[in-house]
Amino acid sequence: MLATERLLEIEEKWAEKVHRIVVLEIDGETLQLIIYLKDGTNLRVTEEWAGAEIARYSYYWLNPANDLKVGWDNAPHYTRLENFPHHKHVGKRKNIQVSFETTLKEVMKVIFSVGY
């Protein structure tokens, strides 16, 4: 998926919950941005696509002071987790847990269910 198409999709899908979006990088199939939510938190998004499949992702949800709430990613460094490489950092970067949220849609569902 092209990053420009993905940005438009994100803007349309979550417009009512988003205060603003800051684009950090938009290049071919790579998208990096900060989504500022209306509750004062923000989500740092990085997605790298290979056609219709997401190859690499990270979604880091930060509180208004920019402290980590939850960070989801698929960096391949926790090989012993049952659903490697998918994992999340909860509260602290070293607090690693199994994650079944592997898309922005699933992450936003979690954020809007606990953060609002």
Model-derived features: where do they sit?
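Negatively charged, low-complexity tracts enriched in Asp/Glu with abundant Ser/Thr
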Residues: 1-47, 51
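Short linear sequence elements within intrinsically disordered, low-complexity coil regions
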Residues: 19, 62-66, 77, 83, ...
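Short alpha-helical interface elements
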Residues: 32-35, 60, 84, 97
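Short, conserved beta-strand/beta-arch hydrophobic-aromatic motifs that form part
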Residues: 46-77
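Short, surface-exposed linear segments at secondary-structure transitions and domain or protein termini
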Residues: 52-58, 78-88, 108-110
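Histidine-centered catalytic/metal-coordination loop motif
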Residues: 70-98
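Well-ordered alpha/beta subsegment
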Residues: 91-116
